[in-house]
Amino acid sequence: MTYQTAIDAVRELKA
């Protein structure tokens, strides 16, 4: 799991 995956997940939660 890369940091990009974590960022994507956070963006989904904030969306």
Swiss-Prot record:
Inhibited by hydroxymalonate, oxalate and itaconate. Its cofactor is Mg(2+). Divalent metal cations. Mn(2+), Fe(2+) or Co(2+) can be used. Pathway: Carbohydrate metabolism; glyoxylate cycle; (S)-malate from isocitrate: step 1/2. The gene is aceA. Homotetramer. GO terms for molecular function: isocitrate lyase activity. Optimum pH is 7.5. Signal peptide: none annotated. It catalyses: D-threo-isocitrate = glyoxylate + succinate. Belongs to the isocitrate lyase/PEP mutase superfamily. Isocitrate lyase family. It comes from the Bacteria. The keyword Transmembrane helix does not apply. Involved in the metabolic adaptation in response to environmental changes. Catalyzes the reversible formation of succinate and glyoxylate from isocitrate, a key step of the glyoxylate cycle, which operates as an anaplerotic route for replenishing the tricarboxylic acid cycle during growth on fatty acid substrates. One of its GO terms (biological process) is tricarboxylic acid cycle. Keywords: Cobalt, Glyoxylate bypass, Iron, Lyase, Magnesium, Manganese, Tricarboxylic acid cycle. This is Isocitrate lyase. Its EC number is 4.1.3.1. It comes from Acinetobacter calcoaceticus.
